Each structure stands twice: as structure tokens, then as C-alpha cells.
From Swiss-Prot:
InterPro entries recorded: HD/PDEase_dom (IPR003607), HD_domain (IPR006674), HDIG_dom (IPR006675), KH_dom (IPR004087), KH_dom_type_1 (IPR004088), KH_dom_type_1_sf (IPR036612), Ribonuclease_Y (IPR017705), RNase_Y_N (IPR022711)
Record-stated family: Belongs to the RNase Y family.
Membrane topology: Single-pass membrane protein
Chain ranges of the KH domain: 214-299
The gene coding this protein: rny
Protein name, entry field: Ribonuclease Y
Length: 524
């Protein structure tokens, strides 16, 4: 019995402990759950706040990117608008020039019509005189015939012969009048046809007409680069001018450097040299010389490509490489202020179109027109450029028609074919554009500068000569091994004396002798 009671008590105690433990455990579990929920809620709030912050940061970043992209697009748009406005202004300028040209042509046509009207009146007057003379002649012949009939002492043969002579004289008079009328009609018809051909050729081509300038503008990123271009005590500018033969002008104009030279080829090489230096960012005498040599090679490629492009555009086949090179050099020469290559292409187009209208060989006309001024880019010669070009092209087995047209376009040789007349006429039309006459002064100045350089090159030991400062200074580079310092002083005096005796110039000209000696050794 005691055992049963003990078991019962143990079971009851176990139940009590189980119930108490159950509620105690539930209580602690509820406390722990509540704490976890609070922590989860706090974590959720923190995550939401972090997400909102990241979203705001991302939004701000994207807004900045969009703003930057918009500003970039706006700058590109503004730049494009500026370029289009400039092109539009150029087109307007070309249209105004063409309007002036057409107005001049209309004035010439009206003057020609006036002259034709005067010639018609004169022809009418002459026709009336011829008719009057013919009537008088008929009256005289009639009187003589009547006298012959009344004279009985003439034999029949004599009377017959006199009548025949009178009829022959009348026939000759009528024939002369007919020939005169045919000649007048043929002349008028030829003038109309020539005028039509010329106007048709002019209307079918269009070339820009711009006077070449002696200045080139190079844009730089900032004015800070001007100091680097000048160099310490101006040594970079001196090295640049000695290497290129071009004046470099650094003034207060923002982000601009100006190159000045009468020779377009030297000016273009100097421009390319300066652009290479600005891209590399390294500017000193050695870098200048290297950039100049690189630019010189690139210009040679540009010359060949320009010649090939001109030949291709005119569809002229089979041109030797030496001639192609000279045609490319025309791009860097001027005639009456006009680019020589553009002028030659214009003459070739005009001559070719007129030859096609006249059923002549258009390819020969275009070839002669393109090469008619090739003598201007040949080395110095005492012959006129037309004869020099003709003699130079003889070694390439050019057609005699082409050679004659080239040599005769300034009258040095007699024209031997219609092609020569067409090339001469096309050359006159091209040089008669508005503004060509005003460019004669600039062309004369260029010739004067070239003559100054040529005078200095005649002395022994001279390597290069450059006319700078619009001809106010001649810079002469001599061989350091062959010309000493004392000889350089004498050479400067001799050059100045020869310029005084042979050249005409305003003011005074400074002669500067540059003598440089380089010693090179290699460490092995």
C-alpha cells in the first residue's frame, strides 16, 4: 500500500512538474518570439531605409548622367548648327558671286546684241549701196547694148564679143554680191554657234572661286600652349621658322596661332608640323625637326593623291607618275590669286566640253587644259612657262596636238589645231572670273619674294633661303663646314649688295645668315 501511495505521489509530482514546466517554457518561448519579431521589424525598417538611400543615390547618379548626356548632345547640336550656318553663309557668298558673274555676262550679251544690231544696220546700208550700184550697172549695160545695135560699122563678131563681155561683168558683179551675203551669213552663224557653245560649257561646270591667302590659322586647345610654342627665350619659334621657312605669329587672339608665308606648300607643311607637335605635346627643337620631316612625307603623299584625284575626276588615263606628281604640286601654287590646280581643272573641263560640242577629241582637250600651266611648277627656267611645259612634256611622247596647245596658249608658238584655240579660250574664261584682276597685286608680291630667295640661292655654300616678314627679311641657311663665321659676314654683305642692285623693294631688307654645325657620334 505504501508503495502504491509513493508511486501515486511520484506520478502526481511528475504531472505537476510537467504542467509547470510547460507553462514556464511557453512563457519563455513567447518572450523570445516577441523579441525576434521586434528585431525583425527593426531589421526590416533598416533594410527599407538602406534600399531607399540606394535608390535615391542611383536616381541621383542617373539624373547626373542624363544631364551630362544632354549637355553633350546640346554641345554637339550647337556645333553642328554652327557648321551648317557657316556652310550656309558660304553658299550665300557663292550665290552672290554667281549672281554678279551672271549680271556681267548679261551685260556682255546686251553689248554684243547692240553691236550685232549696229552691224545689221551697216549691212543693210551696204546692201542698199550694192543694189544701187547694180541698178546703175544694168542701166550702163543696157545703154551700151543699144549703142551696139545702132552702130552699123561693127562686125557681128565684134558686137557679139562686146555683148559677152558685158554679160560676164554683170555675172561677176552678181556673184560677188552673193559671195558677200554668204560670208556675212556664215560669220553671223559662226558667232551664234560659238556663243552657244561657250555658254553651254560655262553652265555645265561649277567651281568655287576663292582667292588664296598668305595666312594659315591653327587652333589650339588653350592659351597655355602658346608659351610652350614660344619656348625659353623664343628658341622654339626660331627653330620652327628655321626648319619650315614660315613666320609663326603668336598674339593675343585666344586659342589661335597664325602662320604666314607666301609659299602655300611651305605654309601647309608648317601647319601640319605644328599640329603634330600639339598632338604629341612635346615641343623643342629636336621634336620640331622630326615633326617637320614627318609632315614633309605626308605632304608628298597628299601631292600624289591630289594629282591622282584630278586625273580621275577628268577621266584622263595613262598619265606618268612624274606628271601626276607635278599635277599634285599645283595644289600648292597660285595664279592670279587662284589655286593653280583648281584653275587647271576648270580649264580642262571648259576645253573638254567645248571640244565635245564641236565633235573634236575631248580627251585631248582636257589633257591639254589640265597641263597647260605645268611649267609654273617646274624648277626655275629662263623660258616662259608655256614653252617650258611643252619642252618638258616632249620626253613623255605626248600628242603633238596637246604639246602645241600647251605651248601656244600665251602666243609663244603658232596655234596648229582647234584644240589650241579651245584651251586658250578656256584659260581666258577661267582667268576672267570676278576678282581675278584684283589678285594681280598679290601675285606680283609672291613673284618678288621668290626673286629675293632666288638671288640668295645663287651664292655658293647656301643650302636654303626663306623670305620672311613679307619680304622684309631674308633668312639664309649655309653649310657649316664650307662657310666660316668671317665668310658668313662677307656673304651677308654680298647678298645685300646684290639685292640692292637687282631687286626693287620698299624700305629695307634684313639679310640673316644662319650657320649650323652638327657633330654626331654613335656609342657601340
Amino acid at each position: 500500500m505504501g508503495i502504491v501511495i509513493n508511486l501515486f505521489l511520484i506520478i502526481a509530482a511528475s504531472i505537476v512538474f510537467f504542467v509547470v514546466g510547460f507553462y514556464i517554457g511557453r512563457f519563455f518561448l513567447e518572450r523570445i518570439g516577441t523579441t525576434k519579431v521586434l528585431e525583425a521589424e527593426e531589421r526590416a525598417v533598416q533594410v527599407i531605409q538602406e534600399a531607399q538611400k540606394e535608390a535615391n543615390d542611383y536616381k541621383e547618379l542617373k539624373v547626373n548622367e542624363v544631364n551630362q548626356e544632354w549637355k553633350k548632345r546640346k554641345r554637339e547640336f550647337d556645333s553642328e548648327v554652327t557648321i551648317k550656318n557657316n556652310k550656309f553663309a558660304q553658299l550665300q557668298k557663292q550665290i552672290r558671286q554667281k549672281e554678279v558673274t551672271l549680271a556681267n555676262q548679261m551685260r556682255d550679251i546686251k553689248e554684243t546684241e547692240k553691236k550685232l544690231q549696229e552691224q545689221r544696220e551697216e549691212l543693210k546700208h551696204q546692201t542698199q549701196n550694192v543694189q544701187n550700184r547694180s541698178a546703175e550697172l544694168e542701166k550702163t549695160i543696157l545703154e551700151q547694148n543699144q549703142r551696139l545695135e545702132s552702130i552699123s560699122n561693127l562686125t557681128a563678131e565684134e558686137a557679139r564679143q562686146m555683148l559677152i563681155d558685158n554679160m560676164i561683168a554683170k555675172a561677176r558683179e552678181e556673184a560677188a554680191e552673193t559671195v558677200h551675203q554668204i560670208h556675212e551669213e556664215a560669220t553671223q552663224k559662226a558667232d551664234r554657234i560659238a556663243e552657244k557653245i561657250m555658254l553651254t560649257a560655262i553652265q555645265r561646270i561649277s567651281f568655287e572661286q576663292a582667292t588664296e591667302s598668305a595666312l594659315s590659322v591653327v587652333h589650339i586647345q588653350s592659351d597655355e600652349l602658346k608659351g610652350r610654342i614660344i619656348g625659353r627665350e623664343g628658341r622654339n619659334i626660331k627653330a620652327f621658322e628655321n626648319a619650315t621657312g614660315v613666320d609663326i605669329i603668336v598674339d593675343d587672339t585666344p586659342e589661335v596661332v597664325i602662320l604666314s608665308c607666301f609659299d602655300p606648300l611651305r605654309r601647309e607643311m608648317a601647319k601640319l608640323t605644328l599640329q603634330k607637335l600639339l598632338v604629341d605635346g612635346i615641343i623643342h627643337p629636336v621634336a620640331i625637326e622630326k615633326a617637320y620631316q614627318d609632315a614633309k612625307k605626308e605632304i608628298e603623299d597628299v601631292i600624289m593623291s591630289s594629282g591622282e584625284e584630278a586625273i580621275s575626276s577628268l577621266q584622263i588615263p595613262d598619265m606618268p607618275a612624274e606628271i601626276v606628281n607635278l599635277i599634285g604640286k599645283m595644289r600648292f601654287h597660285t595664279v592670279y590669286g587662284q589655286n593653280l590646280l583648281q584653275h587647271s581643272r576648270e580649264v580642262a573641263m571648259l576645253a573638254g566640253l567645248m571640244a565635245a560640242e564641236l565633235k573634236l577629241d575631248a580627251k585631248q582637250a582636257k589633257r591639254a587644259g589640265l597641263l597647260h600651266d605645268i611649267g609654273l611648277v617646274l624648277p626655275e627656267t629662263e623660258m616662259p612657262h608655256a614653252l617650258a611645259g611643252m619642252e618638258f612634256l616632249k620626253k613623255f611622247n605626248m600628242s603633238p596636238v596637246v604639246l602645241n596647245a600647251i605651248g601656244a596658249h600665251h602666243g609663244e608658238v603658232e596655234k596648229a589645231s582647234p584644240i589650241a584655240d579651245l584651251v586658250d579660250a578656256a584659260n581666258i574664261v577661267s582667268l576672267s572670273r570676278p576678282g581675278a584682276r584684283g589678285a594681280v597685286t598679290a601675285e606680283g608680291n609672291v613673284k618678288r619674294l621668290e626673286s629675293l630667295e632666288e638671288i640668295a640661292r645663287t651664292f655658293p655654300g647656301v643650302i636654303k633661303t626663306y623670305a620672311l616678314q613679307a619680304g622684309r627679311e631674308i633668312r639664309v641657311i649655309v653649310e657649316g663646314d664650307n662657310v666660316s663665321d668671317s665668310q658668313a659676314d662677307v656673304l651677308a654683305h654680298d647678298i645685300a649688295s646684290k639685292i640692292e642692285s637687282e631687286a626693287q623693294y620698299p624700305g629695307q631688307i634684313k639679310v640673316t645668315i644662319l650657320r649650323e654645325k652638327r657633330s654626331v657620334a654613335f656609342a657601340k
